Every structure is written in C-alpha cells, then in structure tokens.
C-alpha cells in the first residue's frame, strides 16, 4: 500500500502549497498552458451550482487548462450565505438560502438537511477531500462529486465517517486506504496547505477562481462568484494571449458516458439547450435503455447505464 504522509509540495514562485500530482498529471500540466485554482467549501451550494459552467468549460476548452481544487477551509460554514444572501443565521434561514440558490442557478440543492440532520462544521468533509486526493487528483475529483451528491441531493450529513466511506466507495476509491488517510498526517498537512493558500491569495468568499498561465512572473486573474459563461472564455483568451479554439462538439451520449450521473441543467448548459429540450433528448435515451431517470426534489438527474 502506498504511503502518503509527505506527498505535499509548495510552489514558492506562486506561493501555492498543494498535493503532489502523479506522473500522468505532471505530464498533463506540461501540455496545458493554464491552471485554474478553484477555491471551494464542500458545504457551499454556490460552488455546487457552478458545476454546469465548469463542465461546459472543460468540454469546450479543456485542452487549455488544468483545474486544481483548493479547499477554503478557513471560511466558516455560516459565511457561505453572505454576498447575495446576507443575514442567514438560523437553520431555517440556511435551508431557505439553499432553495433560493436552486431557483437562481438551477442546480438541485435540498436545504432540508439543515432541518433534519444539521452540519456543524466543514472541517471533516474538507479533510476527507484531501484524503481522497492522496489516491490521485482524479480520485479527489470523483470523491468531491459524490460527496456533493450525498449532501445536496440526498440530505446526508457529510461530517459522519460512514457517509464519507460511502462517498469513497461510490467514487471507486480504495476504501481501506481512504479510511487510513482520513486520519493521517498527510491529509491534515494537505488541508493546512490549502488553508494557507486561501489566506495568501486573500480569498474570503467561495467559489473563487484564480487563472494562471505558465509565466510565473505574471499575476493570476481572480474571479469571485458566478458570471456568464462568455466571461470565463474571455479570461482564457486573455491569459493565453490568443483566441482559444473550441473542441469539436461532444455527442450527448459521450458526455453522459463520461460523467455517468448528471443533472438536466448540466446537460442544458453544456449543449446550449432549454431544460425542456434537454430532457426530451434524455428521455429518448431512457427509452433505448441507455439512461435511468432519477427524480430529485428540485430537478431531474440521469444515470448512464452502459
């Protein structure tokens, strides 16, 4: 079994402290001229609501950038409601905020978890994300997605270890290794590095994105919150110094096979469709027994079956 206690590193040129990537990831970094540091909190519904735009950016321009998730662990869970939704203090307020975010951005998000099994801290799920990343960057991405599904869709308290283990299983992680890493010095050190990076980059709200190119002397571009899709494409162009070429369109079935479990809004955003049209096309694949419809409280999800 791999031992991960010291697999962290700091980029002194940028002031970034983060996990070592595996060899394949290092090769990918060399091929891609940009990096996007994505500051999140696992309890943040607005971070979850950004998934459709992030997928569209990856599908259309993913050849130009690599994403690094930074857990903004210093931010208090209550502070996630600031910005557009100031003043939320009680559990009822938080549940209402989550419903409003669903209405605003379209990504299903069930705030009843605050009424049924309230969460007291984002520390444990943040630590779990770092533990998952010790099995590789893509393992961390898969785990983060499953953790969000458990929280925002299934109203499960992601501070509980049995729920985190379920996330690890569904993400295809080595569960025995994950359980050990969850209590390891390596995961704790990685989280401390993320907290330090958050502080050094003066990030006080999530989601926040910092775009870097391969010129370490050039400052990154920091963007906090949600903007129209074309703004992010323009930032890519500014950082690259040329107009990026959009990748050939991905078929709907290829997209579903790649991501396996997606919301109607994710399909609609990626393929520039209205929700009704997106669901019409998705239902055709259900009839072909290639998809399963999974209704949620505030919207539909679709699971790929082949």
From Swiss-Prot:
Q: Name one GO cellular component term.
A: cytoplasm
Cysteine disulfide links: none
One Pfam match, given by its short name, reads Thioredoxin_5
Name the predominant localization. Answer: cytoplasm
Q: Does the keyword Transport apply?
A: no
Subcellular localization is given as: Cytoplasm
Highest taxon listed in the record's lineage = Bacteria
Q: Keywords on this record?
A: Cytoplasm
The UniProt entry's sequence similarity note says: Belongs to the SpxH family.
What's the stated role of this polypeptide? Adapter protein required for efficient degradation of Spx by ClpXP under non-stress conditions. Interaction with Spx stabilizes Spx and exposes the C-terminus of Spx for recognition and proteolysis by ClpXP.
Q: Which HAMAP family match?
A: Adapter_SpxH
Q: How does it assemble?
A: Interacts with Spx.
Name of this protein: ClpXP adapter protein SpxH
Q: Which organism is it from?
A: Halalkalibacterium halodurans (strain ATCC BAA-125 / DSM 18197 / FERM 7344 / JCM 9153 / C-125) (Bacillus halodurans)
What's the source species' lineage?
Bacteria, Bacillati, Bacillota, Bacilli, Bacillales
User: What gene codes for this chain?
Assistant: spxH
